Design a protein with these regions (language model features):
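Cofactor-binding loop segments of dinucleotide-utilizing enzymes, especially the Rossmann-like FAD-
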Residues: 2, 25, 144, 167-170, ...
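Residues that mark the start of a beta-strand
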Residues: 19, 137-138
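A Rossmann-like FAD-binding core segment of flavoenzymes
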Residues: 45-94, 100, 110, 116-129, ...
Length: 201
């Protein structure tokens, strides 16, 4: 994985003289730093500059490579002395309530990845056709962590008609940073505290 953990490990190993190859399934190194965190929080040129420094140090990046499809873990082990698995967690937690499979309900990372790819100049079908573009829409984000804050603040920047954040606890008990919540409120996000959805309609 060429995300934060994989790149940090590769850098430390390279410093003490190891030859390091990073395999990653995506077309760019950076993982969550490139595709998950919005540009207004982390400009992508910073990640790209860091990646270039790692390449200059001798670290090899192999992109668009899927373990299990392009090569098995066993095949990789035959060609390397050690393997670090730093694949990250991209699987969304599902809300198991009636209607969770309805149209226009998306996991946070799908929305953020589409937005970040668009910002990088990629063609993104589900953004270009309006599916994952919040422009003119009434957006509801469920959750209170930093990823939820990234979603509401990205929706504001995409010119959503309205943006609400539903969270099951009160403001004092949100897991996200207080600064992020404050920024979202300043940007016009409406928070609905002590709210937990029972069904989607």
């Amino acid at each position: 994985g060429a995300g934060p953990a994989g790149m940090a490990c590769a850098e430390e190993l390279r410093k003490i003289g190891y030859q390091v190859t990073i395999y990653d399934r995506y077309d760019r190194p950076g993982g969550l730093l490139i595709y998950g965190i919005p540009n207004f929080k982390l400009e992508k040129f910073v990640v790209e500059r860091r990646t270039n420094l790692l390449k200059e140090s001798g670290i090899k990046f192999v992109q668009n490579f899927e373990v299990g499809k392009d090569k098995t873990l066993y095949e990789l082990k035959e060609n390397h002395d050690a393997i670090l698995i730093a694949t990250g967690v991209y699987k969304a937690r599902e809300i198991d309530i009636p209607g969770h499979n309805l149209k226009n309900i998306f996991p946070a990372m799908e929305f953020l990845t589409a937005s970040n790819r668009k910002g990088l100049g990629d063609k993104v079908k589900l953004f270009d056709d309006g599916t994952l573009d919040a422009r003119g829409k009434d957006v509801i984000v469920i959750g209170g962590g930093d990823t939820a804050m990234d979603c509401v603040r990205t929706s504001v920047r995409q010119k959503a008609n309205s943006v609400k954040c539903l969270y099951r606890r009160d403001r004092e008990n949100m897991p996200g940073s207080a600064r992020e919540v404050g920024n979202a409120i300043e940007e016009g996000v409406e928070f609905v505290w002590l709210s937990s959805p029972k069904r989607f309609v």
